[in-house]
Design a protein with these regions (language model features):
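Short glycine/serine/threonine-biased micro-segments
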Residues: 1, 59, 76, 99
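Conserved acidic, metal-coordinating active-site core of Asp-based
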Residues: 3-60, 64-69, 81
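Hydrophobic/aromatic beta-strand patches that form the interior of the parallel beta-sheet core
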Residues: 58-60, 77, 92-94
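Asp-based, Mg2+/Mn2+-dependent phosphohydrolase catalytic module
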Residues: 72, 80-117
Length: 117
């Protein structure tokens, strides 16, 4: 079943959301970031540093704290056991972690690309 944090989020996220960006990140975890900071803003910083565009980025996610990143990256995968709203945010799905889903996708990329980096 869903963890306690997910069940209780309606009680505390509205009270704190004006000060920080809160997102359920697992059964018992809650990400608390400064407003305007997310996995996507971190990835955007790295893209800028390396001169990459969103179309040159692939990301993987499994929880609510990944949605913005999944929506904006050129290629995005949600693991198949993620929540429905996370899967809807990604362009693709991959098998769950216990089936090495991320590794399966990365192996496919590496086989298809002569210079992946």
């Amino acid at each position: 079943g869903l963890g306690d944090v997910y069940k209780r989020q309606p009680n505390f996220i509205p009270a704190w959301n004006h000060q920080a960006k809160l997102a359920v990140a697992g059964k018992e975890w809650l990400d608390c970031n400064a407003r305007g900071v997310s996995k996507w803003t971190g990835l955007s910083f790295l893209m800028n540093y390396f001169g990459l565009t969103p179309d040159e980025v692939c990301c993987f996610g499994d929880n609510l704290n990944d949605i913005e990143m999944l929506q904006n990256a050129g290629e995005s995968y949600a693991v198949s056991n993620a929540r429905a709203e996370v899967i809807a945010s990604a362009k693709h799905t991959c098998p769950p972690y216990w089936e090495n889903g991320v590794l399966q996708v990365l192996k496919t990329f590496l086989k298809e690309t002569t210079n992946p980096f």
